[in-house]
A protein has these predicted regions:
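Phosphate-group recognition and catalysis centered on beta-loop-alpha active-site segments
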Residues: 1-188
Length: 188
């Protein structure tokens, strides 16, 4: 099962920070997932003026050759997708609830892998051009996982922190979990 460190090792370190990403690397996660605003600022919520945030360029440099990157586009505006793609290497994965942003990313960089979150206004069929479908844990079903697999989508679930639930999802055919606890997920 793919272990995707949700905002880094956010159970142990402040989320979306360089120490959280470094810790995820130490714990052996397959990917770090991070949130990006306006294409370059790493934060889950809208940036607050005067506060220091890591930049996407800093995170790319930290992770290069050490761990995979999944970059979630938060409320992308015109130009945000292009700015984000300029900073990412070809093996990065873009994630979003925003289907048009992912369509645009694939047009700008054919072959880039994308994760379309489903269930909040986007159906499994709406994710058909993505690499993976991201399901919210409380809404994932056997039928949804099967539908994703039938469309050759990699089924991923967020945010799962209990080992028993991780094992259950693996039995359902889920390929990976976004987790605040990559330490526990790696032990499975």
């Amino acid at each position: 099962m793919l272990v995707i460190a949700h905002r880094g090792a956010s159970f142990e370190r402040p989320e979306n920070t360089l120490p959280a990403f470094e810790r995820a690397i130490e714990l052996g996660a397959d990917f770090v997932e991070l949130d990006v605003w306006r294409g370059t600022v790493v934060t889950h919520d809208p940036p607050v003026q005067g506060r220091r945030y890591p930049t996407l360029a800093e995170v790319v440099e930290l992770c290069r050759g050490r761990i995979g990157l999944m970059v979630e586009l938060k409320r992308p505006r015109a130009g945000d997708v292009a700015r984000t793609l300029e900073l990412l290497e070809d093996d990065a994965v873009l994630v979003s609830f925003n289907r048009p942003a992912l369509v645009q990313s694939r047009a700008l960089r054919p072959g880039i892998r994308t994760v379309q979150h489903v269930g909040f206004g986007v159906s499994i069929r709406g994710a058909r051009d993505a690499w993976a479908a991201g399901f919210y844990d409380a809404r994932v079903t056997v039928r949804g996982v099967a539908a994703a697999r039938a469309l050759d989508l990699v089924p991923l679930v967020y945010t799962v922190n209990e080992p028993a639930r991780m094992r259950e999802l693996e039995r359902l055919g889920v390929a990976g979990v976004f987790t605040d606890r990559p330490d526990l997920a790696r032990q499975l």
